[in-house]
Design a protein with these regions (language model features):
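A short, N-terminal "cap"/entry segment at the start of jelly-roll beta-barrel domains
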Residues: 1-39, 54
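Conserved short histidine dyad/triad with adjacent acidic residue
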Residues: 29, 41-59
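Ligand-binding loop in jelly-roll beta-barrel domains
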Residues: 36, 93-111
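A short, compositionally biased micro-patch
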Residues: 48, 60, 67, 92-94, ...
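Glycine- and acidic-residue-biased ligand/ion/polar-headgroup-sensing regions
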Residues: 60-73, 77
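A cytosolic small-molecule/anion-sensing beta-strand core signal
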Residues: 68-69, 84-85, 103
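Short acidic-glycine-tyrosine-enriched beta hairpin
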Residues: 78-94
Length: 111
């Protein structure tokens, strides 16, 4: 893999009902390297208001959500938290999380 990926070289793709969520998440895979890196992926999610990543458990992986823009509700182990731009959340192994965009949002996900 090259040491840099240019934004204009990365294609967007649609993820319908992500983790049984609502609507379609428009995704851009920034990094993908399960075989060669300690983490498996990094992607940018463009989510319209009302679109969600369904609540799901991380039994043997961890995942980070970083909200670039917009506003949303993070559900972590059944408790809801407001997320604003610049907020970050780590879902540790054995825990569950999901995200609902309450405004048009850009969410970066690393796992």
């Amino acid at each position: 893999m090259k040491p840099i990926r240019k934004d204009n070289e990365i294609e967007w793709w649609n993820f319908d009902k992500c983790h049984d969520g609502i609507g379609t998440v428009n995704c851009k895979s920034l990094l993908d390297g399960c075989d060669s890196m300690k983490f498996c992926f990094m992607h940018c999610d463009d989510m319209k208001a009302g679109v969600s990543i369904g609540v799901h458990e991380h039994s043997n992986t961890e995942e980070i959500y970083y909200l670039v823009s917009g506003k949303g509700i993070l559900t972590y182990d059944g408790i809801e938290y407001e997320m604003l731009p610049g907020d970050v959340s780590l879902c540790n192994m054995g825990h569950s999380h999901g995200f609902l965009a309450t405004e048009d949002s850009i969410l970066v996900v690393v796992g």
